[in-house]
UniProtKB/Swiss-Prot annotation:
Highest taxon above the source species: Bacteria
Record-level GO cellular component terms: cytosol
Function description: Catalyzes the condensation of carbamoyl phosphate and aspartate to form carbamoyl aspartate and inorganic phosphate, the committed step in the de novo pyrimidine nucleotide biosynthesis pathway.
Name by which UniProt lists this protein: Aspartate carbamoyltransferase catalytic subunit
Chain sites annotated for binding carbamoyl phosphate: 55-56, 106, 135, 138, 268-269
GO-annotated biological processes: 'de novo' pyrimidine nucleobase biosynthetic process; 'de novo' UMP biosynthetic process; amino acid metabolic process
Primary gene name: pyrB
UniProt record similarity statement: Belongs to the aspartate/ornithine carbamoyltransferase superfamily. ATCase family.
Pathway the protein acts in: Pyrimidine metabolism; UMP biosynthesis via de novo pathway; (S)-dihydroorotate from bicarbonate: step 2/3
Pfam family, one: OTCace
Keywords assigned: Pyrimidine biosynthesis, Transferase
Length: 309
């Protein structure tokens, strides 16, 4: 297929087609098997993180260098002169984009990536997270990991557990998987952290099966993918948090009735929601998932910066 990702802004998952998602997943798999260290040789990529990040920033910068690109940028935008001097985001983007071939950006403000794409002078902007809005490259590595472990992206039973209300990774991955066939979702959360109504309405309109649960153990035997998330302590008082947290802790014992092919994923960092005894089960795949971020981001950068590979 033609590479429709060439020079495209990567702002949100709904703007990517199934075919584009499949192309990224396929390319990531190829690059994992056969490294291509000169794919973006002589290209310069800005890595601009206006809020602190560890995994996403290091993963992106590793990906850039592994396929031959050069990286410039910063990892804490609040400490840069452009922030201290009060420069607007649009002005910063116009200046930085004149130096580079692609612009990777994380920003605490929802909608910042889209704003950046309007002022980047045609330089493709890749959203590395904009507030609680979207985190599309996390979704790409999640999709690649699911395809790698299940050998398919159709015909899957997928559960999301924990903070489904505020978790941008959950929202984006749900929207991505909804583009595939015969997906069934299990949303496991306390009522206070249930999946947002707008996403459930999107699934209803598309005729996609889903069910709401407050108990994790009962759904595990039906699953191909169990996607755990962290319940954020700051959203509850102490007693309420303790109750909710204890209800959604995955242990090795809970996985005894799971399908052989079940993989446990987590966007990390984990706190208490997956016990360390799960790490040594054949179901644990969250550290490999994090590693796959490098391959998914290599694939995305290569496709955005090359008309053909």
């Amino acid at each position: 297929m033609a590479n429709s990702l060439y020079q495209k802004h990567i702002i949100s998952i709904p703007e990517l087609s199934r075919e584009e998602l499949e192309l990224i997943v396929e390319t990531a798999g190829q690059l994992k098997k056969e490294p291509r260290p000169e794919l973006i040789k002589n290209k310069v990529v800005a890595s601009c993180f206006f809020e602190p990040s560890t995994r996403t920033r290091l993963s992106f910068e590793t990906a850039i260098q592994r396929i031959g690109g050069d990286v410039i940028g910063f990892d804490n935008g609040g400490n840069t002169s452009l922030a201290k001097k009060g420069e607007t985001l649009s002005d910063s983007v116009q200046v930085i984009s004149s130096y580079v071939d692609a612009f990777v950006m994380r920003h605490p403000q929802e909608g910042a990536a889209r704003l950046a794409s309007e002022f980047s002078n045609g330089v493709p902007v890749i959203n590395a997270g904009d507030g609680a809005n979207q985190h599309p490259t996390q979704t790409l590595l999640d999709l690649y990991t699911i395809a790698e472990t299940q050998s398919r992206l159709d015909n899957l039973n997928v559960a999301f557990v924990g903070d489904l209300k505020y978790g941008r990774t959950v929202h984006s991955l749900t929207q991505a998987l909804a583009k595939f066939n015969n997906i069934r979702f299990f949303f496991v959360a306390p009522e206070a952290l249930a999946m947002p109504d707008y996403l459930c309405e999107e699934l209803d309109e598309a005729g996609i099966q889903y069910s709401l649960h407050t108990d994790m153990e009962s759904v595990i035997p039906e699953l191909d993918i169990l996607y755990m998330t962290r319940v954020q302590k700051e959203r509850f008082d102490e007693s309420e948090y303790a109750h909710i947290k204890s209800a959604y802790i995955l242990t090795a014992a809970l996985l005894e009735g799971a399908r052989e092919n079940l993989k446990v994923l987590h966007p990390l960092p984990r706190v208490d929601e997956i016990t360390t005894d799960v790490d040594v089960t054949p179901h644990a795949y969250y550290f490999q998932q994090a590693e796959n971020g490098v391959y998914a981001r290599q694939a995305l950068l290569a496709l955005v910066l090359n008309e053909t590979l």
